[in-house]
Amino acid sequence: MAFSPKESMASRRQALGLSALGLTSAFGLVACGSSADNASSSASATPSEKPKYAGKVSVVPENEATEHNPTHPATVTGEEGTTLKSVKLVNDTTGAELKGTLSDDKITWTSSEDLEFDTQYTLTYTAIDSQKVEGKGESTFGTVTAANQADAWIPNVQEGGVYGVAQILEFHFSEPVVNKDAIEKLISVTGKGVGEGKIRWYSDTVARWRTEDYLPARTAITAKANILGVDLGNGMIGNSNLVVNFSTSDKRYALADNNTKTMQMFVNDKLVNTVPITLGNEDWPSVVGKLVVIEQEATYKFDPTTLGLKKGDPHWYEPFTAHNTSRLTNSGVFVHQALPSAYAYVGVGNVSHGCLGMMPADAQYFFDTFDVGDIVETVNTGYPMADPDNGYGDWNIPFASYSDENYKGDW
């Protein structure tokens, strides 16, 4: 049977359509068959694991460290190819984040802001190992507590004070100083014309400083003890630097001579007054040597019991209030106005218990002219010197022997 052209075209389209469908299906089956094979292959293989962080980081202070010296920075350091991405150091008390610096090679981070004493800190970091895998870490530590801190101060010199040129600088420490040589290097006294000084230790907590000659007159002076963060010994850490600024007055010197029963007063090496005095009696002779005015009071109550005297003792005297007093020793040697009962002996004989007594006008003159830190030297009493720590008898020690704690003078 023959086909018409119209039918023939339609039949061809149908045949081509079926043929195309068959090809598509065939490709589809092939594709489906290939996917199935891959799925089966993947199912039978071991799945790949995510790389683990293998970096190495060292932290100072170590985790949970205590009594860390706050003057020493906290550091984080990457090792064996590990670098640092970020570091954060936080004060646990205030929540404040401390500043720090990351090295250019990103290996080391160092805190650049001062830590505080007796404070807990938390340090966190993100690091990257040699395989570029990130990891995180955390460390906590505490700084030196109050029980292990040490202070320094100068009790006999106040900030902004004015003192005589013979003033001794006495450094006190709240804890025993074991590392004396190291601490001495941290003590300085500076000012125009101030000479080289030496230090003498009177105990593990008290050290005095002086020069060979007196301090220069009318000079601004700064005394320091830079002990912040320094171990004084036994793990006691200095918690601050000591700085005291003061100045000196005119050079004032007094010479009390038992032979003449007089006191000569000098200001800037010029004699300004000579006055009669009474000194200590035979049983209580005045000590000789150079002593420094420790303190001054317009009035001061004298009590014989402080000398170990009791009523009935031949040296007993009734307590009295002295005027225009300048203390020279801790044990009770003063320059002061004599009692009316002693006026007749001033310039003639000795009736005191070691003090230097004057007539009222002369005592007033001394009190108004002299000040703390000025020098008073007594001679020709036939009695030894006062111990150097009974007041400030340091000027009686030869400068060459001043640092020798075993040196024993005439006291």
Model-found features: residue ranges?
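Short, glycine/acidic-rich beta->alpha junctions
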Residues: 203, 207, 255-258, 285, ...
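Acidic, low-complexity Ser/Thr/Gly/Pro-rich repeat segments typical of extracellular/periplasmic
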Residues: 2-20, 28, 33-250, 277
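Structured segments of extracytoplasmic/periplasmic soluble domains
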Residues: 172, 176, 180, 299, ...
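Conserved beta-strand and immediately adjacent loop positions that scaffold enzyme active sites
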Residues: 86, 186, 262, 325, ...
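Gly/Pro-biased beta-strand-loop elements
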Residues: 236-344
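Exported/periplasmic cell-wall-interacting domains
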Residues: 165, 288, 304-411
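Extracytoplasmic/secreted envelope proteins and their assembly/folding machinery
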Residues: 170, 184, 260, 274, ...
